[in-house]
Amino acid sequence: LKKGKDFYMVGGMGHASSVALGVNIAKKKVICLDGDGSILMHLGSLLANSINGNNNFKHILLNNNSHESVGSFKTNVNNINFKLLIKSLKYKNYFKLNKIEKADFIIKKFLQSKGPSFLEVIISEGTIKNLSRPKDLKSIKNKFMKSLKTN
């Protein structure tokens, strides 16, 4: 992550890919990190991403089958076949990472792909102890907006 070029969706769960799409439409390379709980909240944005995202739109799903940041409630996304969903929504590429030994290969292929591209990463439940949320949200927003204007 690059300071000022990354943007945290604090308190806006489900909106990360919509913000990423807006940046991407302006011809910027975008990598959106999303959680399974977040994606469930705005499934319709996946279609908007696939239709409007360009070759530089990359969407990563961190899938632990849990709303980790709000109490570890189950999302039950293990009942969703994301490969079928993503392909039916016309993303150009779908990748899945569920074995660490394949991480370098799959991530390289994902980043080199012409998008919109989607990578589902299967992760285990668990949070970092004492993980804090960013405090100065206005400053983060301003730095992010400034970086969009300069690049």
Where are these predicted regions, by residue range?
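Short, well-ordered secondary-structure micro-motifs
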Residues: L1, L43-G44, V70-F73, I107, ...
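Thiamine diphosphate
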Residues: L1-N64
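Glycine/aspartate-rich loop-and-adjacent alpha/beta segment that forms the canonical ThDP
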Residues: K2, Q112-N151
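A short acidic, often aromatic-flanked loop/helix-cap motif at beta-alpha or helix-coil junctions
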Residues: G14-H15, I100-F105, E125-T127
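Hydrophobic anchor at the start of a short beta-strand
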Residues: V30, F57, N93-Y94, P116-S117
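Active-site-proximal loop->helix
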Residues: L43-N52, S69-L85
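A short, flexible beta-alpha/helix-coil linker loop
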Residues: N64-E68, G126
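Conserved thiamine diphosphate
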Residues: F73-K109
